[in-house]
Amino acid sequence: MKKIEAIIKPFKLDDVKDALHDVGVSGITVTEVKGFGRQKGHTELYRGAEYVIDFLPKVKVEVVVEDSLAENVIEAIENAARTGRIGDGKIFVLNVEQAIRIRTGDRGADAI
């Protein structure tokens, strides 16, 4: 199994959610996060004072899928989240040794 984590722009969440549904993903976890990469922060002016915005708002989408579905999921996220501008985000792929559904005790692929 693979855990796929994608850090994306918040306004792309609905597109990514729809794309994941289209490739057969049945559940996702979404977290509002802040961070920066090459995009860095920016400066804003408010009531005559200058403020540095170090961390930019992003959304982290997490999904665990069987190995056979991983490439389709990665491609779906990539295509749905891409704007072509700096700050589109990152995708991380991790191995998952075990998944357990707490309610039923199902393990492995049956738990996801």
Segments from the language model and where they lie:
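Positively charged, small/polar-rich N-terminal and surface patches that mediate targeting and assembly
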Residues: M1-I112
